Amino acid sequence: MSASSIKMNKYRVWEYWSLLNSTGQNERASIHDDYLSPELLWFGPHPINSITGSAALEHCFYQPLFHAFPDLQRKTDIFLSGNFRGKEWISATGYFIGTFTHDWLGIPASGKIAYIRFGQFSRIDEGKIVETRILLDLIDLMRQVGIHVLPQSRGTEWVVPGPQSKDGVLLSEQDPAASRKSLELVESMIFGL
């Protein structure tokens, strides 16, 4: 897996997400065909849990999501890529932002702008997304509509900002040594606890 392959795959995912931000339901199926493996493995929040296939992803995730938030946009704050255990991965965090007009996943609509924080990891093979794991902050979405399932925070509950320098979206190649050092630091924080 060369640096140019990783860079190309990163651009493919960025392009896919950009197209999802600017197209409607009728165009999404062909976009999925261009960027997703037909055997895509998708893992997300309950009650969706897991989805197999790009057509099922549209039916089970995107259609209900865009129905609930018709003007939904993805705002990515951090976007990076690299190899992990011999596989190419793209990872990102940010927010889905849109007007919550219809209930979604049993959460009642507020009619107001909502922010759904996401963390997403997508594995790429031969230019297609073959696996996605996405974390959605549904507890915070529930808080935004007035449902408190956790004790009230002692701090401010609001949008977690991206990097102040606005340089969290890395579309260009990065120094492999610096990338490896960053990965080792993160893994030591995760696995060293």
Question: PLM features: residue spans?
Answer:
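C-terminal and inter-domain tail/linker signature
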Residues: 1-193
